């Protein structure tokens, strides 16, 4: 089942075309990566999918229904982390979480559980207005996942985080996905997308330039070559077919082979190849 979809969605801000006939679908239970550099329409797409913006043209569906039909019960199944997500500045981390938990009818024990997973368990008394950008981002994420949403929108969720904290957040997201949460993730971090996402879409100039499973995209755009690294440091290449590989290995009989692998690009290299632009 498609948990959300867009069909030929377009949106302009004045004379600027933000999205131009955008079409894609996300299956329930997957982590879907919406990838591209700043300014290509990733945040705009989330705002459309959460009804913060209305399209000029096209159809949007969430939970299998036109987005205009979503009621409060449907929105209670959604979690959002974005630049527009707010906190109560004069309240502590714990107080912000407690307020949200009370509104959702959640037990206080759930607060401690989530704060532990985002690395804020020892910072519950800190006032929100004094938080660093990274800590604020983790608080907003904690609030977004507190109620175990069916659908989670994450706009650059680890952009301000250090590697250790990023790894912890990735573990949390995998755990939630294993529990049934569908995650729509925007990022310009292709390594993050490769680690987390079942499928990805490359967004460029308001359109989908390419989409697919990361491993399959790497094979699709791989060089038709195989690289053999010998133990003495010498590197050799041959065509990627059984005959050429077999002939090369036969010629190397008696020499120590350290590795044999195809020359597959990473997602960042594929994005550059497909769109002609870098991610930064």
Predicted stretch roles:
Residues 216-280:
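Short, charged/small-residue-rich alpha-helical element at the C-terminal edge
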Residues 211-212:
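ABC ATPase "signature
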Residues 98, 102, 108-124:
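Conserved ABC ATPase "signature" region
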Residues 58-69, 73-74:
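Conserved ABC transporter NBD signature motif
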């Amino acid at each position: 089942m498609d948990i959300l979809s867009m069909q030929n969605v377009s949106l302009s801000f004045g004379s600027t075309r933000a999205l131009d006939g955008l079409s894609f679908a996300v299956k329930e239970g997957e982590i879907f990566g919406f990838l591209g550099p700043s300014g290509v329409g990733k945040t705009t797409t989330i705002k459309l999918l959460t009804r913060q913006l209305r399209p000029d043209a096209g159809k949007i569906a969430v939970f299998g229904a036109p987005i205009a039909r979503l009621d409060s019960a449907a929105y209670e199944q959604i979690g959002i982390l974005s630049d527009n997500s707010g906190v109560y500045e004069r309240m502590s981390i714990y107080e912000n979480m407690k307020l949200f938990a009370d509104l959702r009818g959640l037990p206080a024990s759930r607060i401690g559980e989530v704060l532990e997973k985002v690395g804020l368990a020892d910072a519950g008394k800190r006032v929100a207005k004094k938080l660093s950008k990274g800590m604020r981002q983790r608080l907003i994420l904690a609030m977004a996942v507190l109620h175990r949403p069916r659908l989670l929108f994450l706009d650059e969720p680890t952009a301000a985080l250090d590697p250790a904290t990023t790894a912890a957040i990735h573990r949390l997201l995998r755990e939630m996905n294993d529990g049934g949460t569908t995650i729509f993730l925007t990022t310009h971090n292709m390594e993050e997308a490769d680690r987390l996402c079942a499928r990805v879409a490359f967004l460029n100039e308001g359109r989908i330039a390419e989409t697919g499973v990361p491993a399959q995209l790497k094979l699709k755009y791989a060089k038709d070559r195989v690289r053999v690294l010998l133990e003495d440091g010498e590197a050799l290449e041959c065509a990627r077919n059984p005959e050429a590989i077999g002939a090369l290995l036969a010629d190397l009989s008696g020499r120590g082979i350290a590795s044999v692998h195809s020359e597959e690009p990473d997602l960042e290299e594929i994005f550059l190849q497909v769109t002609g632009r870098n991610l930064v």
